[in-house]
Amino acid sequence: MYDLQKVIVIGAGPAGLAAAIRLAQHNKLNPVIYELRNPDAAGIGGSLGIPANGLRVLYRLGLWDMMLRRGVEISKTILHSAAGSILREVDVATEPKQQTGFGYFRINRVDLVQCLRDAAQERQIPIHYGKQLTSIDEHGGDRVTVTFSDGTSDTASLLLGCDGIHSTVRRLYVDPEMKPVYSGFGAISAIVDDVDSHERKDATCLHSTITPQGMLATAPCAANQTFWFFSKEVPLPPATDSGDERDGWSLYRQNELAAWRSSLSSVLDCMQGQWGQYMRQLVGSSKDLHFYPHYRLPLGGRWFVPSGSGRDSPRTLLLGDAAHAVQPHAGQGVALAVEDVLLLSGLLTQYQAGEYTALEEVFGRFDRIRRPRIEQINELASRNGRMRRNQSPWLVWFKEWYMWFMLHINWFWGMSMSGVSNGDILYDVEAELK
């Protein structure tokens, strides 16, 4: 029997905010959001790419017009050789727009989060910051209580874990054995203001080059702002006394940033032509560099605790990266998270209409629908990530030739930008509800 009223959302990133907004406006539920970090830290991050499948969901959430003022629509992706020549220009907007109404969009993470916060505030959704979750208790199958380190607690009929790849909801309750694994790759990046580009006619393009040391790419992310990153293989740092890999990365950031600058400098020195000149100018204008190691969650993890595990009917579900974080190399992280949100909302509508008799049936259907897509995107991300491996100059030359050849036939085989199939970016999660 449908008995949902209040929803607790753990995490005030894109997944958590989108979930609260959708469940409030479409399902008429009463969400409340709890976030570990303070408001400034909760919005940190670099630039995000969102393909058509994610943009369509964000439009249905009523966010598109707000986002459009803060980001940039990308028209094409341009692949450069290290020698400076253009290997191929690929239109990434026309066909998706014709079929979905949307193309490919880039926006700073902090701006996307602010759009979501503004939308949540318009709907009077409370957001509590600085709340460290310490325990989760499901009571008799009809409610769930969360307790925080400051001694406060809250109870609702549904709990959504939207707290990212290092999810506390997953660690404390849903799947304690599931741990993030390191992909072997990391990236250094920066957002640069007001780069002189008066001679360039491609201010709405994403540019990339594969080098022997990794991949270098850049794209606009806001008015008068450009994002660039250098992604390469990075060994796992030595473990610290705490046993937490994140502590090792913290030390790595402090000690190895100079080595990254040196590696990047050698890459830039080998790049020629106008493209190389522009990238040296862009990197030289960067003030704040950030390093991020890329983690993912192994496939097969649990997204809810089934009643057959000795517990009552479940009231807790993981969404977004908390459930299925993939490497960023498919450009689908935000899109997958908001797809989760739209699907859950639709299933809860069907639950209210009597198509399901228990919340566990809703969770089970959600799981069966999402698993194949997550597996597909995970494989794509892993495959794209391997292009960042260290390699000889001769192998880079061969790959440049191979990509030139493949990009000429991708559209014939139904492929678009960087090997992402049209089926991936034209996917409509709401069609799964029919």
Range-by-range predicted roles:
Residues 1-434:
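FAD-dependent flavoprotein oxygenase/oxidase catalytic domain
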